[in-house]
Amino acid sequence: MIINAKGPASFAEKYIVRSIWENKFPPGSILPAERELSELIGVTRTTLREVLQRLARDGWLKIQHGKPTQVNNFWETSGLNILETIADLNPDGFPLLVDQLMAARGNVSNIYFRASIRHNPEKVVEVLAGIHSLENDAEAYATFDYQLHHTLAFASGNPLYVLILNGFKGLYNRVGRYYFSSQEARELTMRFYLKLEKLAQDKNYSDVPALMRTNGIESGKMWQKLRDDLPAEMGHDKS
């Protein structure tokens, strides 16, 4: 098992998670005793204990006082916060994971974009004013696009959408910088921003679904043109 990690805790976490992913510690099984596991991984028991607590919070493990640590079925117990971990565990499946991420974000954003213009059009106009001074580069577009979604999710009146977005953040930032490295993708996105700005200025929330649908189709086609050249290292966590 080859693991790239910056320190003992990171190594231990990646070792255990990869062992779960590769079914060496299958769902429902009991982890080795703390002393045995710390010797196996090569970390102190204190470090291991901290790692186990963190993995339990993320849904990988079940820790109960006085009982051995049990491996969970993470598909049933974890949240969006493990998206980046899954990408790191399965780099070959990264393009498909991104497809699924974009589809999920698109479905959710359809709701809060419309709701934000309906309930708080002034806030939408305010944040979209930033497009007129937006630097024409990948980093600026990726940053602005995430900020736009975050602001509109808040403006929709349902803060749960913000929590969903937070789960996408790390992975989306990686993909966003790659997507917006394309001049054609930036131009497509700017046209969408301008149309959205006009709807917000007119307080026309009724036409938002049609705009989102059209943009989803066009950006989806753009992504398909770009995904085959997706750098392999993008699926790897650097931590």
UniProtKB/Swiss-Prot annotation:
Pfam families per UniProt: FadR_C, GntR
UniProt keyword Plastid, yes or no: no
Gene3D superfamilies: GntR ligand-binding domain-like, Winged helix-like DNA-binding domain superfamily/Winged helix DNA-binding domain
Keyword Transcription regulation: yes
PROSITE patterns: HTH_GNTR
The gene coding this protein: fadR
SUPFAM superfamilies: GntR ligand-binding domain-like, Winged helix' DNA-binding domain
Protein name: Fatty acid metabolism regulator protein
Organism listed in the record: Shewanella frigidimarina (strain NCIMB 400)
